[in-house]
Amino acid sequence: MNKSLKRTISAVLASAVMLTSMTGTQVFASADGTSVTATATAEKTYKVMSKSVPTYLFQYDKDAVMKTKLYFMNGVNDVPYIEIDDMVQYLKALMQMKYHGTYDLKVEKDGDTVTLTRETGYMATINFADDTIFYWDFDGFNTAESKTLIDVILTVWDTADGITGLKTVKSTERYGTPVTMNAADYGIDFVHKGNKYYIPLQTFSDIFLSPGKLGVALYNGRSLIFCRGEQAEFYVDGKYTQLGQVYYGKNGKYATNKISEELASFSACEFCFAMDNLYGLREKHSIDSFKTLLLQRESGYKLFSTKSKTIDRELHSIVTDVIDDRHTTYNMSSYASGVDYINTLDEKYGGGYAIETLADSFGAHRAERAKFYPDGVPAYEEVGDTAYITFDKFRMDMAYIDQLNYDDPSTIAGTFGAISYAVNKINRKDSPIKNVVLDLSCNTGGDADAAVFTIAAFLGKAGISVENSKSGALVTNYYKADTNFDGKYNSKDTLAGKGLNLFCLTSPVSFSCGNLVPCVFKEDPNVSIIGQKSSGGACTVGTISTATGAVMNISSNFRLSYTKNGSFYDVDQGAEPDYAISKLEHFYDREWLTNYIDSLA
């Protein structure tokens, strides 16, 4: 039999395995490109074993290492489960750690069901007979304490207004429909035995941690680590951090490239379960489901491989070749592949066409800007009658506000400092400024809080709409900004209503929040877009891990939108300029640009 035919047969067999595995019967598969093996169990009978493992919460502290008891079913010693009471304790601790609120969960056990009820009354019911998770209100259960149902800006508590310089002045809400997540459809079992209830650790990470932006859980067969899912937590400047030594092993010794059949099969199924429930742009990518996607891909069976590098390569390909939405990125390779395998994948296969196109545009714009500003572009600059405000990232950076001196531009730090300084200067007595340009031509996004602060400074009020693609919930929140941080929200805090000509300079680099801002401006008659079309990016970013130990960012269920005539429009298509600029040098030759803007008045 020739090699090509063997691979074809292998792919067909793997497809059958995936179909069986993801339709309710647990199947363990191995696919190395030439063969697939599978075993199935028809009944839910379990022998439960346990092991206590060292546990780390976002840092390495040898004096504060905890122990967590994990459970393993029927001798499969690398697919860990967590008992429901332990899961709840971690969920409460992580929610309180991140948001400092009054988060609490009440646990009610009744036969094969466990109901978790928030202090707000929102609940989730886990059915251990049907392997389902039911939410009366998915958003209400997962959100931090906030004034509105979905608030990607003030997601903490009422006193957040004083901390962020933002105030919610109005909101409209439309609640979503009940949500049921069916793990059984993916061959994932929840286990009820005696008076104990167990769910897979990876399901806990994907379905309970990720939606609340609480990080991810990683298990390498030795330790349990809760982390943000960023490589810098484990490896910096060619050296392992202490947490990296725990996860990847001393000098990367856990990089064996070996994964068991059972773990590979479970991880593939759980990945599909997570993406089908958490990825926010599925229908826009014509992905009916990720389990169908694996069947449609010639290489989809490789997620079932017993070689971790083969699995990581397929995950990398799905992220960069299929999804390729710039927000969805492959962040970390498996402990079994080694910390630097991500670099091998990026160097050999690239980061995806969309990201590489953005990087090329970013490089070209930065290089052109450097010709005019070799020492760096100032955050605030006046050229004739035109003020320019420039920053390349939106950052929620309130720490330096106390150091801001309106008479000293060197004290400007980050988005809040730049906007506060600019509003103060532009609104000063006898100001010569007639035109204001917000230069986002090299802005690739950042914190939504800072983007909303900027919009409110320009318009007087920022209206941001959010849609949850999973639940269907729709919310529009309106914010005001306190740009001088005096605790008052008034006309001194904004450029609106001052008779100024307001502009936003955009390019194909303007992405994510750098795209959200001009999209909101586009619908306001008082701001004109100049430059070139912005680059899209509609969703906030979520993070998930896989059971084999890789981590990726994904476009979450939360789609940022604007509202027009009562309808919601996401911002993924970008904003077309009102006045186009074709030559790159004209973006940064501010003498030319000022004269051009004056000619438009």
Predicted region positions:
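N-terminal secretory signal peptides that target proteins for export/translocation
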Residues: 1-4
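Sec-dependent N-terminal signal peptides
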Residues: 6-18, 22
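Sec-dependent signal peptide cleavage junction
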Residues: 19-39
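N-terminal low-complexity, Pro/Thr/Ser-rich intrinsically disordered segments
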Residues: 32-65, 252-255
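Extracytoplasmic Gram-positive cell-surface binding/anchoring modules and repeats
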Residues: 66-109, 187-203, 210-220
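Short Lys/Arg-enriched alpha/beta "domain-start" segment
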Residues: 119-123
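Flexible, low-complexity junctional segments that flank or bridge functional domains
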Residues: 125, 133-436, 440-444, 449, ...
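C-terminal "post-core" interaction segments
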Residues: 233-258, 268, 431-432, 444-601
